[in-house]
């Protein structure tokens, strides 16, 4: 019995001595395979990747297997990619691969494939990115009874903008808000996108829907009645409301476009219908709200002429503030929703590239 106690004491002393000499190398991840530990490990080299609409991106994912656990490798490896919803309660199938059998789903058909850089590479390539591709993706690798996962976030370069229709503020339920963004070449923004916009200076005093069904608004300069006086800046959260009955504005998100946005040089000012026809005559279409915001934010477009847009609003983009042209800040200035038949303005057009 004394011998056993002595052996235990010696073991503890040895462990303490060596733990004092151990340093953690933060640049490397060392995986130790325990006897009953995981035999399959899945990792993403990057937690987040960035791209833009129309571009291509690779979602990184690699797997590491214990060859002694799988014998001669008779188990086929199954790779599955899914997209996570904002509440993580539902997954949308994207791509599945097992040997020579591969399948893509929904809007990803013809746009996704495995990178295949090495035998253990499960990275997914997505081409011709759309606004809807933004979000978090899960890479799952299955071999026999073993499986493991990794999550990668896909972020898009773009701009968040507040939106309300001709009817006025606080007139959209959640479903109408989604459609309103789509009509303006955009999608309803996520909380992360709104938060990033707030950090970049977005200040807006009207609450709007976000993609997760919450209602929030960003305040950089707290004041009455916008966030309250003597309070800290931040994204104010109204919480979750009835998607069918509750009515608010909406925050939309858009990204780079494949085309030309421009102010049409025309000898006279135009009614709304004349503006629509003038763009058509020029081989283009009347521009949408998302396109004027994308041109302003991503291309630095600047024009001190108010012009019609597709939704019947009149706006103008200023990236270089100056006297009589948004002197206080760079912004897309909103004139309003004038009478379409009697008010005369210029027009902004958009010509898509084939």
From Swiss-Prot:
Domain of life according to the entry: Eukaryota
Database matches in InterPro entries: C-type_lectin-like/link_sf, CTDL_fold, Hyaluronan_bind_Proteoglycan, Ig-like_dom, Ig-like_dom_sf, Ig-like_fold, Ig_sub, Ig_V-set
Domain Ig-like V-type: 38-152
Signal peptide from the UniProt entry: none
Glycosites: 21, 56
Molecular-function annotations in GO: hyaluronic acid binding
Keywords: Disulfide bond, Extracellular matrix, Glycoprotein, Hyaluronic acid, Immunoglobulin domain, Repeat, Secreted
Disulphide-bonded residues: 61-139, 181-252, 205-226, 279-349, 304-325
Cellular location(s): Secreted, Extracellular space, Extracellular matrix
CDD domains: Ig_LP_like, Link_domain_HAPLN_module_1, Link_domain_HAPLN_module_2
Function description: Stabilizes the aggregates of proteoglycan monomers with hyaluronic acid in the extracellular cartilage matrix.
Family affiliation: Belongs to the HAPLN family.
PANTHER family per UniProt: AGGRECAN/VERSICAN PROTEOGLYCAN, HYALURONAN AND PROTEOGLYCAN LINK PROTEIN 1
Protein name per its UniProtKB record: Hyaluronan and proteoglycan link protein 1
Gene encoding the protein: HAPLN1
